[in-house]
């Protein structure tokens, strides 16, 4: 059994087709727990109609309002009891083999330890009806390939086991996003692997954003050359500090050393920061060179502008 965790908010334009794509999955042994965060449109009405059609959908009506998508996902996750879990975004469309392939990729692993397997997606411009490119261009599987990204894997592309769920249900004070928590937990407290397949349509519109997404060469170059954003985003850094406060004593010594070096670099000289990058295996998008270029082009630490 796989539990699908769906956090909704004002998703009336997209939610129905996403729920129908879940119903069309070739893997049938699933349940979907849905929690709405106070929508003022027809999202809840649409969900209730689907629940009446398929008993595998469960709308959680507990009057809890988080006003934060990451916290909403983690709250909804607390209702899961199955061995495996998938997050689900309200505005994507899952290809029919998504659950089947993700389950096949994780079920034979050592599930006595926390496990995550993530996949990719097709970028979909629903307004122009264009499908092109991969949604994810970064594939972090360790601390040094994650921390400078200022994002995590695409949470809705992943499957994880009960051991990982137990980690995610331990609260951290500054939670930037649920999928960042999933990523850093996989990189430091368990095992995280990439399945080289596109298993859903990632809808691109003005209200969503996924770090490290594919686009035209001109757009990618423009984003890469931006100098008004810092190399280390303040919100992700605060989330890292909160994570380390809770889980620091459970990390391997090598990972703990890397996180400590990363945290300490905020207050160090430019030279020491640069030497840290060169002495380790720090990278973005699998490339140290790209990280070095950004290092010299951007402020080191701060918020996004």
Predicted regions: what they are:
Residues 175, 181, 203-305:
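C-terminal subregions of glycosyltransferases and related glycan-biosynthesis enzymes
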């Amino acid at each position: 059994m796989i539990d699908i965790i769906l956090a909704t908010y004002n998703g009336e334009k997209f939610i129905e087709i996403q729920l129908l794509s879940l119903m069309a999955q070739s893997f049938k042994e699933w349940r979907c727990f849905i929690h709405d965060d106070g929508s003022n449109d027809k999202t809840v009405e649409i969900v209730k109609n689907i629940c009446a059609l398929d008993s595998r959908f469960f709308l959680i009506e507990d009057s809890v309002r988080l006003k934060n998508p990451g916290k909403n996902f983690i709250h909804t996750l607390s209702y899961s009891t199955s061995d495996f879990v998938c997050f689900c975004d309200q505005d994507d469309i899952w290809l029919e083999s998504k659950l089947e392939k993700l389950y096949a990729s994780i079920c034979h692993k050592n599930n006595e330890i926390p496990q995550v397997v993530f996949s990719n997606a097709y970028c979909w411009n629903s307004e122009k009806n264009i499908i092109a490119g991969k949604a994810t261009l970064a594939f972090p599987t360790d601390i040094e390939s994650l921390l400078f990204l200022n994002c995590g894997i695409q949470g809705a592309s992943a499957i994880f086991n009960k051991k990982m769920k137990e980690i995610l249900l331990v609260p951290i004070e500054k939670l930037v996003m649920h999928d960042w928590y999933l990523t850093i937990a996989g990189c430091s407290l368990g095992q995280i692997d990439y399945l080289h397949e596109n298993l859903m349509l990632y809808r691109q519109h003005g209200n969503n954003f996924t770090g490290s997404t594919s686009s035209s060469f001109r757009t990618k170059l423009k984003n890469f050359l931006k100098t008004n954003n810092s190399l280390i985003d303040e919100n992700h850094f605060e989330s890292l500090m909160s994570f380390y406060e809770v889980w620091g004593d459970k990390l391997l010594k090598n990972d703990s050393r890397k996180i400590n070096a990363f945290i300490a670099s905020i207050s160090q000289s430019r030279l020491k920061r640069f030497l840290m990058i060169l002495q380790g295996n720090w990278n973005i998008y699998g490339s140290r060179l790209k990280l070095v270029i950004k290092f010299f082009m951007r402020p080191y630490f701060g918020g996004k502008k």
